[in-house]
Amino acid sequence: MGGCFSNRIKTDIASSTWLSSKFLSRDGSKGSSTASFSYMPRTEGEILQNANLKNFSLSELKSATRNFRPDSVVGEGGFGCVFKGWIDESSLAPSKPGTGIVIAVKRLNQEGFQGHREWLAEINYLGQLDHPNLVKLIGYCLEEEHRLLVYEFMTRGSLENHLFRRGTFYQPLSWNTRVRMALGAARGLAFLHNAQPQVIYRDFKASNILLDSNYNAKLSDFGLARDGPMGDNSHVSTRVMGTQGYAAPEYLATGHLSVKSDVYSFGVVLLELLSGRRAIDKNQPVGEHNLVDWARPYLTNKRRLLRVMDPRLQGQYSLTRALKIAVLALDCISIDAKSRPTMNEIVKTMEELHIQKEASKEQQNPQISIDNIINKSPQAVNYPRPSIM
């Protein structure tokens, strides 16, 4: 864990008296198989008892983090603070700094029922879910008013920090690294959506994508996740929660939540990876504060796309490959939720881009390559045809 999380839209989730059980089969890295689990009402005690997690004592976590010393803080946000600590790899007992395995301990602010609900939801989902592109929750602590979560430590921090912070510690991410991160995050979402019933992540954003030492992307913070619709229902109805700039328009307008809401958020992050811009940035010129609204007209035109592309990526990519991702992002942010691709379809496209080498045909006739990209997209066909530079 590299940090806490940015401010969410300040509204409450619809109240519920239960959180459903998750008994998910372990899955491969592509996230394309179907996971199944039982579905039943569960109390807080049942959730904690059935989670595949260690129940840490407060004294153990104090020892692991050197009594939550200020210089152990690695992140801070609405949930509380995140501290760096160490535990023994075998026994999971506290160990001396620099020995054993590194952990991230997230301590809940001791106020508010919503924070407790999110803490419990995190245990309910990550206590049962297991996938290479989901951050690993090791354990929890519940003592009187103290509520903490213990995760694997994500050495590289968040995607948000690497994309938007400047300085010697955060070097610009290369094109290939960005594509690989997008693929990893897509696999994590696909795994959630392939569960029966589906799991809707609901807060997909750059700050919730954490990176290990090899820059592998993992989804974190399941406090807002919830089960998808059952039976013939197309959505679940909730009060709106999420992060400004990432939430799907139909969800903001109606509270109707589906897996296609996550797809929209994925499209926003794709645009952030392409542009190096935040989803919402009031420091940009007037008319460019909202990344989706500003970028949308440029995503199917080769010449115009250059205006969107992060200048730090110059010389690292072909415009044809960049256009494929831009068109994919355009499909994801479609106003019509039904026309957005599934995460399985997105994973397939991203895998092709990840392994694709520069094709000689692109150099010979780039217009043919671009036409093929445009014709395959239900959104791009409605935009002006690109011209060749």
Curated annotation (Swiss-Prot):
How does the protein's chain sit in the membrane according to the entry? Lipid-anchor
Pfam short name (any one): PK_Tyr_Ser-Thr
Q: Which UniProt keyword terms apply here?
A: ATP-binding, Cell membrane, Kinase, Lipoprotein, Membrane, Myristate, Nucleotide-binding, Palmitate, Phosphoprotein, Plant defense, Serine/threonine-protein kinase, Transferase
Record-annotated active site:
D203 (proton acceptor)
Kindly indicate whether the keyword Membrane belongs to this entry: yes
A single GO BP annotation from the record? defense response
Cellular localisation: Cell membrane
- Assigned EC number: 2.7.11.1
Lipid attachment in record (S-palmitoyl cysteine): C4
What this protein catalyses is: L-seryl-[protein] + ATP = O-phospho-L-seryl-[protein] + ADP + H(+); L-threonyl-[protein] + ATP = O-phospho-L-threonyl-[protein] + ADP + H(+)
Is this entry keyworded Membrane?
yes
Q: Which residues carry this modification: Phosphothreonine?
A: T238, T243
Q: Which residues carry this modification: Phosphoserine?
A: S207, S237
Amino-acid positions noted as binding ATP in the UniProt annotation, renumbered to this chain: V74, G75, E76, G77, G78, F79, G80, C81, V82, K106
| Positions where Phosphotyrosine occurs in the chain | Y151, Y251
Tissue expression remark: Roots, leaves and stems.
Q: Where is the lipid attached (N-myristoyl glycine)?
A: G2
Any one GO MF term held by the record is: ATP binding
Family that this chain belongs to = Belongs to the protein kinase superfamily. Ser/Thr protein kinase family.
Tell me the function of this protein: May play a role in the regulation of plant growth and development. May be involved in plant defense signaling.
What is the name listed in the Swiss-Prot or TrEMBL entry for this protein?
Probable serine/threonine-protein kinase PBL11
Q: Which gene encodes it?
A: PBL11
